[in-house]
Each structure stands twice: as C-alpha cells, then as structure tokens.
From Swiss-Prot:
One of its GO terms (biological process) is synaptonemal complex assembly. Pfam families: SYCE1. Belongs to the SYCE family. May be involved in meiosis. GO terms for cellular component: intermediate filament cytoskeleton; synaptonemal complex. Residues 44-181 form a coiled coil. InterPro entries: SYCE1. Keywords: Coiled coil, Meiosis. This is Synaptonemal complex central element protein 1-like. The gene is SYCE1L. Residues 1-24, 206-242 are annotated as: Disordered.
Amino acid sequence: MAGKLKPLNVEAPEATEEAEGQAKSLKTEDLLAMVIKLQKEGSLEPQIEDLISRINDLQQAKKKSSEELRETHSLWEALHRELDSLNGEKVHLEEVLGKKQEALRILQMHCQEKESEAQRLDVRGQLEDLMGQHKDLWEFHMLEQRLAREIRALERSKEQLLSERRLVRAKLREVERRLHSPPEVEGAMAVNDGLKAELEIFGEQVRSAPEVGAGEGEAGPELPRARDEEDPEPPVAAPDAL
C-alpha cells in the first residue's frame, strides 16, 4: 500500500464502560426515587411487580450491553492486529519496490553499456574496412608506379639498343663499301685483311644485340618490337667470300 493507513475510529472499551456505568447510576437513582415516592403515597405494594419487571429489564439490558462491549472490544483488538499486519506488509512492499527499482537501474545501465560497446565495435569494423581499402589502393598505386618505371627503363634500353644497332649497321655499310671499292694504293691487301677483321667484330656485335634485348624483355613486361623501317638491316657477307 502506497499511503499510510489511517487508524480506525473505534471507541476504547474503557469509554464504553464509563458510559454504561453512568446510565446504570441514572437508572438506579430513578428506581430509588420511585420507591421513595411510592412509600410516601402508600401505594408501594401494587407497584412491586412493576418494579421487579423493570429490574429484570435492566438486568437483561446490562447483560446485553456487556456482550456488546466484549464484542466491540474483540473487534477493536482484531482491527488493531489487522492494522499492524497491514503496516508490516506496507514496509515489506516498500523494501521490495526499492530492490526492484535498483535492479531496474542496474539493468538499464548494463543495456546502455552494451549498446555503446556495439556502436564502438561497428565503428571499429568500418574503420578497419576503410583501412583495408586504403591499403589495397596504396599497393595498387605503388605497383602501377613500379610498372611505369620498369616500362620507362625498358623503353630507354630499347632506344639505346636501336641506336647502337643503327651505329653498327652504319659501320658495316662503311666497311663493306671500303671492301668492295677497287684498291688504289699499294698494300691494299693488308687494308682488306684489317677490314675483314673489323667486319667480323661488327658482325658479332650485331648478332649479340638481339640477344641482349631478349634478355631484358624477360625481366619486365613484353613490349611490342619496333621495326626500323628507315634503316633495314643489309645482309652481312661472310668474310671468306671477300
């Protein structure tokens, strides 16, 4: 019970007994006054039966009042016991209510902590996903840069090889021209022998140039082979044919 129980408005047995005693005294005084009056009038005898009847009525009324008083006293005690019991039950219910409210508060705090932890885990998972995506993009960018550097290096090597190849071909054409030209001075045979030796060296350089290009092509991605249309490679004559 939430409110305080109000005390019952029941009169105490002592007050009831006092009221009953006063009524009894008044009735006794009335009887004495009646007896004295009858004695003076000389008519006491005819009124004895009436007096006895009234006394019996008073005794019955007294007995009934005593029984009502005992019942009232018993009811008063029972109501007070019930009031004490209800007060005790009220205290017990207030204690239970306090415990339930404390348990509810703890449960709400626990739920809030769980929700906060779930939000932190969600944010952490999203952050890890973003970091993973950023790492993949960074690795792809680094790979792209490395491949671009390798491609530029291969292109420079290709240009260098083409330049060397054109230079060697020019030297070969010069040597062949000199070999096929008629001798004009003495000692032309010695010059031809030197030119043949130089031609052999240039031929070896020409044959080794494609091998170097093929070796570098294995290290990096395959590039389209450029065709030197301006300076086609002439057939190299064998030294013995000269």
